[in-house]
Structure formats: C-alpha cells, structure tokens
Amino acid sequence: GHYESEKYFIDYKKEIIQFFKIKKEKVDINNRYKKDIDNSNSVSICIRQNRYSEGKHKDHDKSNKFTKDTIDYIYKSIEHIKKNVEKPKFFIWSNDLSNLSGYFNQDECIFIDNKQNKSVNDFYLFNFCKHFIVGPTSFHWWGAWLNENPNKICIRPLNLNPSNNIDFWPENWVSI
C-alpha cells in the first residue's frame, strides 16, 4: 500500500527523519555528485520510466503517453523553478537514463547514473538537494518529504498520479 499521506504521521516528522537518516558509512557515495549538489541550487528530479505507462513494452519514444506527460510536467516544473531559484542545477535520477539526455539541456542537468543499482546512494543524495520536482513515485516522494531544507520548493504533478488518494501530496507542495 501507499504510505504517503502525511496527515497520519506529521506529528512524528522529526522522529521519522531521524529513523530514516542514512549514515555515511552505509553508502558507497560518489563524492563528485555530493559536491555538485552541495555547491549549487540543486533540484532533484526522479523519473521512473514505464511504471504506469499503458503498454507493457519499453517504448521510449515521444509517442509513449506516460513519457510525454511526464516530460511535459518536468518542463513546466523546470520553468517554475527557474522563475523562483537563482541559477538552479538539475540532478536527474532514473531507472533508465538511456534516452533522457535528448530531452534536457546538458548545461543545466547532471544525470546520476547508478550503475551499481544501489538505491540507498540515491536516497542519501536526496538529503542534500535544495529543491524537488517529484514524479509519481513513492521513492522520490519520501526523498523529498524527508529532506530537511526548510526553504525547499517541492513541485508535484497535478494529474500524473493514478492514485485516488486525495491527500497523497503534502499541502505545501506546488502542483503543476
């Protein structure tokens, strides 16, 4: 099930953050990514491809409705961030980076390729991002929610999540 309705646990946010805090010694971290994230107005984008797409095949072209809708949402969110954040740098995580570079400006984006498939490294890096463009993925939802930056901007999709859970998204997250 989904556990992304903060109304059930908001009173325990500090304790939950401490419980899920990842210790440095538990991760095999690439310091270059962390340094880039720390030294920029970092914006985390996580794209989990083909999770909710209509077809069961891995069709990565622009005709794939989920990919198209997701990319459109991210473009609009990037524009919102650019209007509200000085010199943002976008860090893109995905379960499949093979076709994403063609969609994004290489000068503004860093693609984080987790070849070792250690999600704990990605989750660890989410802690240091300053802002989030959250897709319909519980993994990134938790990464954004657990991030302790009090000034973070979290953008969430208005219509990409197939869930009928009306309180899925925190109220202070911007919907686009």
What are these regions (language model features)?
Residues 61-63, 108, 151, 172:
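Generic alpha-helical propensity signal that fires on short helical segments
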Residues 162-176:
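Leloir-type glycosyltransferase catalytic cores
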Residues 71, 75, 80-164:
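Donor-binding and catalytic core of enzymes assembling or modifying cell-surface/extracellular glycoconjugates
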Residues 24, 56, 124, 172-173:
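Solvent-exposed, flexible loop/coil residues
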Residues 1-85:
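Secretory-pathway luminal glycosyltransferase catalytic domains
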